[in-house]
Amino acid sequence: MTSILKYAVLVLSLSLTATLQAKSINDSSQVQKLSKSQIECLSRAAYHEAKGESDKGMLAVIHTTLNRVKDNRFPKTVCGVVYQKSQYSWTKYNPKVKEQEQYARAERLAKEVVAGKHKDNTQGALYFNSLHRKPSGTVCTVRIGGHSFYKPVK
């Protein structure tokens, strides 16, 4: 199989599994119901977006992803949010995990967030970037490491 076809199969299988196994996340109590595939999507996002950041920075990426799941403007599953077109740049290429220790850290932190061990350190952010360019209609909630986090202006 070509790498593009393999990637498409991966995305479709993760999305289908997510749809079948995960209910929409409307509040923090439902975050605890994430399936193994949802945790994997959350861990991959944290790894690829923040592997060079501190735990605090990686936690902020995890919380931003979960905040999107809770917001009705985004897909209702973690995998749906992570693989939504043009949202997480790394998904376009689906790179392999190369630093196993960093991935293990991302997975541990994702599981800890799901278990309720870490409060949202982004103040409800739905967006982040490393360019310090504020998306229109948003306000910066916090800067952690090389990322700035934003939420919509109400």
Question: What do these predicted regions represent?
Answer:
Residues 17-19:
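N-terminal signal peptide c-region/cleavage motif recognized by signal peptidases
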Residues 23-154:
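Bacterial extracytoplasmic/cell-wall-associated proteins, especially those involved in peptidoglycan
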